[in-house]
Amino acid sequence: MRPLETEYKDWTIRVITRSTGRAWSALVEVWVPGKSGDKDARLVPYNVTSQSEKAAQETGRIAAVRFIDAEAAKG
């Protein structure tokens, strides 16, 4: 499946899933508004496995939303 790319509060979110044998994990990246490209990506802490690729995408996106909200709370 292609990476899931969405937006939240003008941030860009990309979730890249990968199979880990019987489960799925993901690499989760975000970009602040106005930034793009791999050099501007920020990695989101995410260390969860899921039973399906779709579930890995969903939980990865949830982790990104929490990360963005935490960054916004810092001011």
Task: Give each language-model segment a name.
Residues 1-36:
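N-terminal segment of the canonical double-stranded RNA-binding domain
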Residues 40-75:
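Acidic, low-complexity intrinsically disordered segments
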